[in-house]
Amino acid sequence: TQAVKETSGQVLFYGEEPAQTYYYSTSCGYGTDLSVWRGTRAEAYPYLCAQAIDERNMELTRQLGGQESVAAMAPILQQAQLLEQSDVMEAFLGQRDGDFYEKEEPWYRWSYRAETVDEKALWERVWIRAQADGQCVFVPGEAGEWNAVKERTKLSENTGKIREIRVTKRSSGGAAQELLIESENGQVR
């Protein structure tokens, strides 16, 4: 609440336009760009870029300021893009060193392992998601292509006892963009 009180009544600008700003309570040590919000073009908001959330990068951002800072920060942005690779992200998450702001927070780099899964509830949530966004849940087609789920029967053909859930695509900064659910009857992405 301290930051909210200290910035009350202030408006942040990027050039001549009010800046789009977002809040999140914790990260794994990196923030990401707007590609995490489906349908949002990250390049439309170059000031919201994936980068390490640490004192070194924050100081560089403060020093550069303005629109020229995006170009000057290219090496930092390339660093964040490496985290799109699952093996790089996994290695990064295994590291506990670094001067990341949130490293002492309880939800910093958390993990969760379930011994059992309410599969019926999970598949129901997947179906609800497919109905809400027709281009977000996919099943394999006969020729190996991925087809958007439009009918519940197409989803049901690929469900069943879950064998594995894994991240198959990450955004710059390492945020999970896509999951693959492998079941006894097929796959859902």
Give the label of every model feature segment.
Residues 1-189:
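Conserved, single-site charged/polar hotspot
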